[in-house]
Design a protein with these regions (language model features):
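Extracytoplasmic electrostatic interaction patches
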Residues: 83-174
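N-terminal export/targeting and maturation segments
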Residues: 1-84
Length: 174
């Protein structure tokens, strides 16, 4: 049974500083669109033993290779923050417009998941300051998302506002 919206809002409020810190790190220190932590070993460069012995005079921080622009101290902090907020990963979507010299970053942090890829239910914390301006997005402030989905029991994606730019997302597919 997915957590209620009320329980997720309480959880967000309790850990709001950690959620905001995740956003700060991802928006200011990372590069590109990606999953963190990396989903496969191929996404991370690991030095072989020859290269490690060649750099043995360097400290661990000097040997650190950025992963999506994130240095080791940021990754360690992110690991700690994700553990605190109970989310196993962050999906980062970054869009850059050279003409406007601006960057748009949205985050999805899965909090609950049940089922398989093609059929299941998930609830996530989402940061997306432009969500309300998108077409075909269903946002509701009334009722629990779980109850709304149970009444229709169709494939659905619903959002509920939590704070400015922050939402709960319920995604269900059969």
């Amino acid at each position: 049974m997915p957590p209620s919206d009320e329980a997720m809002i309480r959880h967000f409020t309790t850990h709001e500083a950690a959620f905001r810190k995740v956003y700060e790190i991802m928006s200011e220190s990372s590069e590109g669109s990606f999953h963190y932590p990396p989903l496969s070993p191929e996404e991370v460069i690991i030095l072989d033993s020859t290269e490690q012995s060649d750099t043995s005079h360097e400290t661990n921080d000097e040997q650190d290779l950025p992963v999506y622009g994130l240095l080791k101290p940021d990754r360690l902090l992110l690991d700690s923050l994700l553990s605190e907020i109970g989310c196993g990963l962050v999906l980062v979507d970054r869009r850059e417009w050279e003409t406007a010299d601006s960057v748009y970053v949205s985050l999805v942090m899965p909090y609950y998941s049940h089922g398989i890829v093609d059929a299941g239910t998930s609830k996530s914390f989402v940061y997306d300051p432009g969500l309300e301006s998108r077409r075909n997005i269903r946002i509701t402030e009334h009722g629990d998302l779980n109850e709304i989905y149970r009444r229709t029991y169709n494939d659905t994606t619903l959002y509920k506002p939590v704070r400015e730019g922050w939402y709960i997302e319920l995604d269900h597919s059969r």
